[in-house]
């Protein structure tokens, strides 16, 4: 059992090192995309399933409340938090539409959709991205593996942050770290002189 624990930590560290080499440009572009949207009075819609939903919710909470420093609230909505809306849509046998319907209702040109999917193939996330495209929104996608179907939907203005791994647990860990990096970059760009 102790060896297995060491393997988990070693895999995580190796994934972090690979990501630190491969992802800074994409993370920087994503942060600037989010900052630009916020500075123009727009909002960020976030979605994911399972652990990815938790990461989406963490991002939205960090925008609305704060990340590490006190600052004004920033507009972000985690689309996976309203159980009444989610179950109403799913109850009508439209599970694939649970996020897309919300994007069509709440999203506007200039808003950003933060779509988080470990493999990039979750139908409800893919449909949300398709809906965001019809609303002239920009997409920031956190993926892994080969980026899946989601990667193929992105345009030149969109940003994919693809974790260099084929292990779901490592991808999810890196998604959380990436979300924290994005929050840190947003705070330090918009509020550079805030005290800790």
UniProtKB/Swiss-Prot annotation:
Belongs to the SIS family. DiaA subfamily. This is DnaA initiator-associating protein DiaA. PANTHER family: DNAA INITIATOR-ASSOCIATING PROTEIN DIAA, SEDOHEPTULOSE 7-PHOSPHATE ISOMERASE / DNAA INITIATOR-ASSOCIATING FACTOR FOR REPLICATION INITIATION. Keywords: DNA replication. Residues 34-196 form the SIS domain. NCBIfam families: PRK10886.1. Homotetramer; dimer of dimers. The gene is diaA. PROSITE patterns: SIS (PS51464). One of its GO terms (molecular function) is carbohydrate derivative binding. Required for the timely initiation of chromosomal replication via direct interactions with the DnaA initiator protein. One of its GO terms (biological process) is carbohydrate derivative metabolic process.
